[in-house]
C-alpha cells in the first residue's frame, strides 16, 4: 500500500474542525472546577478562544479557497481545487500537478516550497 495523499484545503478544514471540538472539550472541563471560579472561568475562556480561532481558520481557508485554481481530476473526472504546484484531488486523493517539469516525478510536498528549485 502506498502513501496516502491528502488535499491541503481538506487538511486545514480538518484542523479547524478539531479546534472546535478541542475548544468545547476544554470549556467543558471548566465545569469540573465549579468551586473555584477563577479556574472555571479560565478553562471556559481558553475553550472559547479555541472555538474563535477555528472560526478564523475557517474564514481564512474560505478566502484562500476562492483564489485557488479549479481543475478536473483526470482520475475521477470531478472538479477539485489545487493549492500550490502539487496537491491531491479532494475526492480520490490522486496526486496532481500543473507544473510540466514535475510530471512523472514522485509526489512530494517539498515542491510547493519557494526554496525548492526544479
Swiss-Prot record:
Signal peptide: none
Family: Belongs to the UPF0295 family.
Annotated transmembrane regions: 12-32, 43-63
InterPro entries in the cross-refs: UPF0295 (IPR020912)
Subcellular location(s) per record: Cell membrane
Pfam families noted in UniProt: DUF2614 (PF11023)
Protein name (Swiss-Prot/TrEMBL): UPF0295 protein BCE_0593
Cellular component GO terms held in the UniProt record: plasma membrane
Disulfide bonds: none
Top-level lineage group: Bacteria
Keywords from the named record: Cell membrane, Membrane, Transmembrane, Transmembrane helix
Amino acid at each position: 500500500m502506498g502513501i496516502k495523499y491528502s488535499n491541503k484545503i481538506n487538511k486545514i478544514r480538518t484542523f479547524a474542525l478539531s479546534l472546535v471540538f478541542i475548544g468545547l472539550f476544554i470549556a467543558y472541563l471548566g465545569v469540573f472546577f465549579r468551586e473555584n471560579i477563577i479556574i472555571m472561568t479560565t478553562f471556559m475562556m481558553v475553550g472559547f478562544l479555541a472555538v474563535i480561532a477555528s472560526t478564523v481558520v475557517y474564514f481564512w481557508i474560505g478566502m484562500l479557497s476562492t483564489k485557488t485554481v479549479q481543475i478536473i481530476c483526470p482520475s475521477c473526472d470531478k472538479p477539485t481545487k489545487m493549492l500550490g504546484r502539487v496537491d491531491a484531488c479532494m475526492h480520490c486523493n490522486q496526486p496532481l500537478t500543473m507544473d510540466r517539469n514535475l510530471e512523472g516525478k514522485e509526489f512530494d510536498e517539498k515542491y510547493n516550497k519557494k526554496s525548492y528549485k526544479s
